[in-house]
Amino acid sequence: MSALLSEDYLNDYISPALACTKPTEIKKEKFVTEDGEFQVGVEPQELEKVTISLSDCLACSGCITSSEEIMLSQQSHSVFLDAWRELGFDKCGSAGDAQCTNKLVVSISPHCRASMARYYGVDVDAADYAILRVFKEVFHATSVIGDGAGRLLSVKRVVEELMERRKASQGTALSSICPGFLIYTEKTKPKLVPMLLNVKSAQQVTGALFKEIALEEGYDVDTSLKDGKRTNVQYHLTIVPCFDKKLEASRPDGEGEVNCVITPREVLAMLGEMGVSFRKYLGDWASLDKQLQQSQLGMLRAEMSPAGWDPLLHWSIPANGDGYSDGYAYQYACTVRDAHVASGCAAQVVSVPGKNADVLEYRVVEPSSEGGKVIARACVLSGFRNIQNLCRKLDPSGHKKRSVRRVAALRSRGRKDSSSEDSTGTPSAISNALGGTANPAECDYVEVSACPSGSINGGGLLMELAPEREEMGETPLPSSTIGGNARRRQQQLQELQAMYKAQIRITDETPTSLPPAALPPLPPQYTMQYTFYIQEEDPAKPDIVTVGNTW
């Protein structure tokens, strides 16, 4: 094998194919008359359409339990529509109708906004405008927001905990914001659970914010309709990029925060079933000048935001360094840098690429030191192969670290490709601090995602472009179009990443520097924390793949 090529460079992306699809069988019975005769050569009658659920794809590999299958079945657009009708939202005249005794609130992640914008061939602002109108006018929602404030609060809390751990020298911390990685760790790597930060993701923090408002206003967040209660209920629907987020919403520690989780694919299917055209709600957006577009969008965002909340903040994200990660690792590095600069010392954040595209490390470097002193390290890591490698190195059960052959070509490539976030500092000192490639196991914090490339590659996103023939209503994509070949999927991902990086608004301040007045009232501390469930590891059980690559 060439010295420049090793198995560490192989990407673990596996495009969905026949090998990972549950075969479908349509059993048709012959229609036999009383005389014992039956006809041949006639067109068969249409039978019930066969569907494949997420549990079909995951349960076969042992990824989820039967109880988790039940949880997944409760998180679908069909379940939402049933609850929507049961709670009487279909009879409301408009958002805020006095006759509506219940309240529907909707949140959406920035990845989904970019995905829907690309799918319909419009910019993100136009997609936001149509999303707001659809959920206001069709579904009669009271509030529709991005999850930006919840994301900022989640990042803020993670950074605060990391700074506390830094003072106590507590070693590597792992994120728990990805349910796929969290479930995998709880079930198969119990010895790594103490390394997990128990700070909830943007989805659940946003849900906690909505829950606090509901309780203050006298609404019930229990939508189980016990005792026939169908009034003064708040229902929270969230739109996310990954299917494993459905399991996150079903965790006992998130009760009442999120009632239903769907993906953009399911939004498309839901609109198709209802005969609603998404394009119709773009209206005359394209004919308006930029100033008028922003004016109309701003008014609509303000109208659909809870009272006292900054609407612009909800539709923004914290700076993330690489352009499309969740920003936890980058914001921690920036906070350490700012604290170091405030103490009178020079410092800057530099990025160091890993051995594949799904690993990126941020190092806080003091360039004035001899040789360049590394003050702090944080890493963004995604994909199951990288997760396995990280777990092997961190697991204290005695796994030997596999020696990695470091050749001069790899070292020079790491230095050459490393990029600096700041322009100051001594080049030689910075170069010395960037020796080699990223090493997540030695970082203070690792932001982990099960999906290769993170949530921007979530399995629920719309990677294709909308067919031009969609005039009267939106047609759900056939399952055969999901994913496509690996090369085409990678091109679609790159286009989506570029749109996300260019069009999703980034807040000017870091989450830790935002004034309290700019953020919604912080929910109680316990509502922002997970409760971890540890399953004892069976040493005789092989380490099977329990995280799907395209959740």
UniProtKB/Swiss-Prot annotation:
Keywords: 4Fe-4S, Iron, Iron-sulfur, Metal-binding. Gene3D superfamilies: 3.40.50.1780, Fe-only Hydrogenase (Larger Subunit), Chain L, domain 3. PANTHER family: NITRATE, FORMATE, IRON DEHYDROGENASE. Belongs to the NARF family. Residues 421-431 have a biased composition (Polar residues). This is Cytosolic Fe-S cluster assembly factor NAR1. InterPro entries: Cytosolic_Fe-S_CAF, Fe_hydrogenase, Fe_hydrogenase_lsu_C. GO terms for cellular component: cytosol; membrane. Residues 395-435 are annotated as: Disordered. SUPFAM superfamilies: Fe-only hydrogenase. GO terms for molecular function: 4 iron, 4 sulfur cluster binding; iron-sulfur cluster binding; metal ion binding. [4Fe-4S] cluster 1 binds at C20, C57, C60, C63. GO terms for biological process: iron-sulfur cluster assembly. [4Fe-4S] cluster 2 binds at C178, C242, C451. Component of the cytosolic Fe/S protein assembly machinery. Required for maturation of extramitochondrial Fe/S proteins. May play a role in the transfer of pre-assembled Fe/S clusters to target apoproteins.
